Amino acid sequence: MRLVNSLGRRKILLILAVIVAFSTVLLFAKLWGRKTSSTLDEVGSKTHGDLTAENKNGGYLPEEEIPDQPPATGAFNYGEALQKAIFFYECQRSGKLDPSTLRLNWRGDSGLDDGKDAGIDLTGGWYDAGDHVKFNLPMSYSAAMLGWAVYEYEDAFKQSGQYNHILNNIKWACDYFIKCHPEKDVYYYQVGDGHADHAWWGPAEVMPMERPSYKVDRSSPGSTVVAETSAALAIASIIFKKVDGEYSKECLKHAKELFEFADTTKSDDGYTAANGFYNSWSGFYDELSWAAVWLYLATNDSSYLDKAESYSDKWGYEPQTNIPKYKWAQCWDDVTYGTYLLLARIKNDNGKYKEAIERHLDWWTTGYNGERITYTPKGLAWLDQWGSLRYATTTAFLACVYSDWENGDKEKAKTYLEFARSQADYALGSTGRSFVVGFGENPPKRPHHRTAHGSWADSQMEPPEHRHVLYGALVGGPDSTDNYTDDISNYTCNEVACDYNAGFVGLLAKMYKLYGGSPDPKFNGIEEVPEDEIFVEAGVNASGNNFIEIKAIVNNKSGWPARVCENLSFRYFINIEEIVNAGKSASDLQVSSSYNQGAKLSDVKHYKDNIYYVEVDLSGTKIYPGGQSAYKKEVQFRISAPEGTVFNPENDYSYQGLSAGTVVKSEYIPVYDAGVLVFGREPGSASKSTSKDNGLSKATPTVKTESQPTAKHTQNPASDFKTPANQNSVKKDQGIKGEVVLQYANGNAGATSNSINPRFKIINNGTKAINLSDVKIRYYYTKEGGASQNFWCDWSSAGNSNVTGNFFNLSSPKEGADTCLEVGFGSGAGTLDPGGSVEVQIRFSKEDWSNYNQSNDYSFNPSASDYTDWNRVTLYISNKLVYGKEP
């Protein structure tokens, strides 16, 4: 019996050993085989809980409960950071938003006419950054990077309760890409004109400008953007295979067709609308290889792998060497570095791809051949002033992926992983401030983001503080000396973008996997509405014995969400007791208007007893938070009694609190939307209604204006500009000096930079209005090289489209200056009234994006982080120098 038991136990142990060994092999195959040549077929056959292709809500996944979390061991709550970084993409959504699943109340439907100009539905997708253009190159890159994060760290997303959220955000973008691909060789790569879009500052829900659609096809191709979209959809086909097999197949179908389109055309000749915003500087071969690698992983078709490798000699080399490039970063323009890493793992040897990715990561960490990326004093690996954190955190994500690779160098893997942690921690606040909105200590509160700011006045200055919290947004980041300004106008340091968060999400997933941290189970972006959104301001224009004249201004400052109102009305209540006592009636009262912005006025109507009202109906007049003339409408109306009759306003309900010479918000003048009370209180009501919690429809009517200006930028070499004939004969009129002041702020304080970003404020302290078309500003600098230069106006209170920029060479170079940028204004800029000011935020760069040395520039002031008087920039009015000193 003992022998049998002993033999039985041995058999059992042997069987268990075999099972364990076999399970280990399967696990290894799953984890690492998928990272070499697996197509995830064996994984794709499984389901995730009860999620299937039959899930409701258009294929979007339901919100999941956050599982119990293990104890956190890291310096930060990486789970919360991951949760919020994913949420940021919900804030960027364009199109029709489902209120049943929306996790924030300050976003609504927007861009619902996108594609109508082309007869196609192009709604959906993400707005690019703090603007509202849908640029498909950075958008598809962002979707691809988010998908890669899920591919690598799916378990982290599940454990943190963020799996469905990230899949839904990726699907939101991919659904849009599929819409953009209506035919095999046709792809719509952009919606919205960048110049017109940047000329307006307001919420997405009430955009007034036309939004043209741009496409590439076989006659005018765009291989870069098409291949990047192919990559995004190929990755989506892999990660959605578990939860929605049909959708996975649809993504793969489009990915294959788009790749063939990009690969057989090999040209970006048709990709023109994004020039000046998202040029494809690295060419298209990196995107072709990147897409081919992902298609190989999605299909196991080795022809894609062969194709990816065949372009490796076209990815680029370091200047004057035969060394594959390594001194940049994975980004929307250049996906070479991610391709290095994927091919290194697939080949799984010590070949050229492994050498290439290690060379790249070495340069970012310990250095390569005695050279290393710049590090700030506080530890940020700093590549460039535009999105410095974006580059560091994305490279850190690649470092994490390398560290997981079984065949990677173990010592390097440790170094890379420590680098990744340090960069994640820098972004989250290791220096004493967080660079993620709504997270950690001293986070950014004023990101360069139109909808989060919530202006109703087409102005970065109104309101002075942001109305909404853009949770999870990673801002651009500091300069090379750790300097950072939380300023809405500083788009260099403080803009946010879809591609900024893309690699950051993957990095946070790895940090969460290593160190834990608890996402907030109650987190959302639902905000209290702290102010009246729709209301009337009123005052007394004039009065006499038998009349009262009221000036009333209807305001729409809606922001939860912003919305267009076309059916507003208000009522002015009066008590006609004195009229009745004089033997007259309501029919004897006359209502007239001397000034009216689109309203219809009723006769006096009965309310109850001796209380009557005049209804001012603005139906058909669009009032929306889109600018000074858009968000408010004024009506001046008079109520007159017959001659010899006294009209006493003191007993009128709506007269309460009104006075002459000023207007005040009045709850006694109730406002209605389509007949529903949305602000104020009627006579006899116990409490007032406010637009904070009204039942206004969240549907946003389309705003159209009669015409929209298109902002322009000069894109010419300095030598193409003739030195102005008046350059050496400028009249020195010091008599007006002091009446007009030019202030300067530096939007980019780096000594070495590939763009110069001055900001100007002109202040009129005089007594006369200034015609802005007579005004010129000059900024003096050294050009360093012969490349032509580009000029952009990023924002101006005079309207971007009304700002011009011209470069010219000084006839006699001076110390610190051989070139001058002259900024002017078009006739549409209007006048600058006494006591007023106008702001201009511009930037310029060389066509080849080579660096300037700002440190020796005459007009450069590195300490001017905010507006300050600076006499090394000059101001001219009608060719008279009125401020500053020429070099």
From Swiss-Prot:
Q: Fetch the InterPro entries from UniProt.
A: 6-hairpin_glycosidase_sf (IPR008928), 6hp_glycosidase-like_sf (IPR012341), CBM2/CBM3_carb-bd_dom_sf (IPR008965), CBM3 (IPR001956), CBM3_sf (IPR036966), Glyco_hydro_9 (IPR001701), Glyco_hydro_9_Asp/Glu_AS (IPR033126), Glyco_hydro_9_His_AS (IPR018221)
Q: State the reactions this protein catalyses.
A: Endohydrolysis of (1->4)-beta-D-glucosidic linkages in cellulose, lichenin and cereal beta-D-glucans
Signal peptide start-end:
1-55
| A Pfam family hit | CBM_3
Q: EC class of this enzyme?
A: hydrolase
Q: What is its EC number?
A: 3.2.1.4
Q: In which pathway does this enzyme or protein participate? A: Glycan metabolism; cellulose degradation
Record SUPFAM superfamilies:
Carbohydrate-binding domain, Six-hairpin glycosidases
Query: Residue ranges under compositional bias (Polar residues)?
Result: 686-729
Q: What are the boundaries of the region Catalytic?
A: 56-518
Specify residue ranges for compositional bias: Basic and acidic residues. Answer: 43-53
Region Disordered: start-end pairs: 40-66, 441-460, 684-730
Record's Gene3D superfamilies?
Answer: 1.50.10.10, Endoglucanase-like (2.60.40.710)
Residue intervals of the CBM3 domain: 529-684, 736-887
Report keywords, A-Z: Carbohydrate metabolism, Cellulose degradation, Glycosidase, Hydrolase, Polysaccharide degradation, Repeat, Signal
Gene Ontology biological-process annotations: cellulose catabolic process
Question: GO molecular function: any one?
Answer: cellulose binding
Active-site residues per Swiss-Prot or TrEMBL entry: D131, H448, D486, E495
Family membership, please give it: Belongs to the glycosyl hydrolase 9 (cellulase E) family.
Job description of the protein = This enzyme catalyzes the endohydrolysis of 1,4-beta-glucosidic linkages in cellulose, lichenin and cereal beta-D-glucans. Principally active against barley beta-glucan.
Stated name of the protein: Endoglucanase 1
